[in-house]
């Protein structure tokens, strides 16, 4: 089953969209800062956003506490779930021995919004070197076709005060960072 996530770049400040979401009955229920570091040994040229994610080992630190969670373990010898700040250099050395190099080092601030009855959250993300984006996926739509999922997500965002069209493309974060220019597609999980 393929899942659609939309992620549209926004052109006004966070406070503007915070106000719109709140005026439409949503509450800001969660905020965090995230630091993600991606490593790969594969050629990422021509890949989709999701394919890039699948080709990378990711370290994730939320709110700059304690250390980094290790995600997408592509190395069999990598039996590590978590590393501290002090262990990053040693971890990167092990990755380098296996041909993995750092390809992305990105920080973002997440702001999640929802209201009673919602099965998902609208996410406003302030992503360094990219800007402010709004993200949404909804598991209630997963059984629909890709186009139907996308249209439902756009309709849902518009019901919260946005004004997107079905023809609008979302911004792909990793592809944008990789190519150092904005890259767009219909599915930020595709």
Region annotations inferred by a language model:
Residues 104-143:
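Conserved, surface-exposed functional patches that form binding/active-site neighborhoods
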Residues 57-59, 122-124, 133-134, 156-160:
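Generic hydrophobic secondary-structure signal
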Residues 23-25, 74, 130, 139-141, ...:
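General N-terminal targeting signals
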Residues 1-119, 163-190:
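N-terminal strand-loop-strand beta-hairpin
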Residues 141-173:
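Mixed-charge, glycine-accented linear interaction segment located at domain edges/termini
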Residues 1, 11-17, 129-133, 151-156:
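Glyoxalase I/VOC metalloenzyme domain signal
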């Amino acid at each position: 089953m393929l899942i659609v996530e939309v992620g549209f770049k926004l052109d006004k400040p966070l406070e503007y969209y915070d106000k719109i979401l709140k005026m439409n009955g949503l509450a800001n229920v969660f905020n965090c800062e995230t630091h993600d570091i991606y490593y790969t040994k594969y050629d990422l040229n021509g890949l989709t956003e999701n394919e890039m994610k699948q080709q990378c080992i990711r370290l994730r630190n939320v709110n700059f506490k304690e250390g980094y969670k290790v995600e997408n373990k592509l190395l069999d010898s990598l039996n590590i779930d978590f590393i501290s700040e002090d262990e990053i250099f040693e971890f990167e050395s092990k990755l380098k021995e296996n041909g993995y190099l750092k390809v992305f080092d990105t920080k973002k601030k997440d702001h999640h919004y929802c209201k009673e009855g919602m099965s998902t959250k609208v996410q406003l993300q302030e992503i360094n070197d990219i800007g402010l984006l709004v993200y949404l996926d909804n598991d209630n739509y997963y059984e629909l076709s890709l186009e139907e999922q996308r249209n439902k997500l756009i309709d849902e965002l518009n019901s919260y005060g946005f004004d997107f069209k079905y023809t609008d493309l979302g911004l792909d974060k990793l592809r944008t960072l990789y190519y150092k220019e904005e890259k767009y597609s219909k599915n930020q999980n595709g």
